[in-house]
């Protein structure tokens, strides 16, 4: 499986972040073809205190080809263009990963 993860840094204006995430990021993400799962995490802290991140979003696809195909759609292009200014202003970190899960 392949994942696309976005980590939102803590910001002074949390309202703008929440509005962007709820009204833009999440609806576009959920509209991507081939999307298998979405995991959203509200960061509560880290082992040594407060984290610099506030929100994590992980989208899972069957494989890299499925992720690339999804991002090449009109919805995928709009999503990436919406996220780009956040990345350029260092308000998010984002990456793709070849991932696996193990059930215990």
Task: Give residue spans per PLM region.
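Macromolecular interaction modules
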Residues: 1-104
């Amino acid at each position: 499986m392949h994942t696309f993860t976005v980590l939102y840094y803590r910001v002074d204006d949390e309202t703008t972040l929440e509005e962007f995430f709820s009204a833009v990021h999440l609806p576009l993400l959920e509209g991507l073809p081939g999307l298998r799962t979405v995991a959203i995490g509200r960061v509560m802290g880290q082992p040594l205190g407060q984290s610099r991140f506030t929100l994590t979003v992980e989208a899972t696809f069957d494989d890299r080809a499925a992720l690339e195909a999804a991002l090449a759609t009109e919805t995928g292009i709009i999503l990436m263009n919406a996220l780009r200014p956040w990345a350029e202003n260092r308000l998010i970190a984002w990456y793709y990963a070849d991932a696996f899960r193990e059930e215990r």
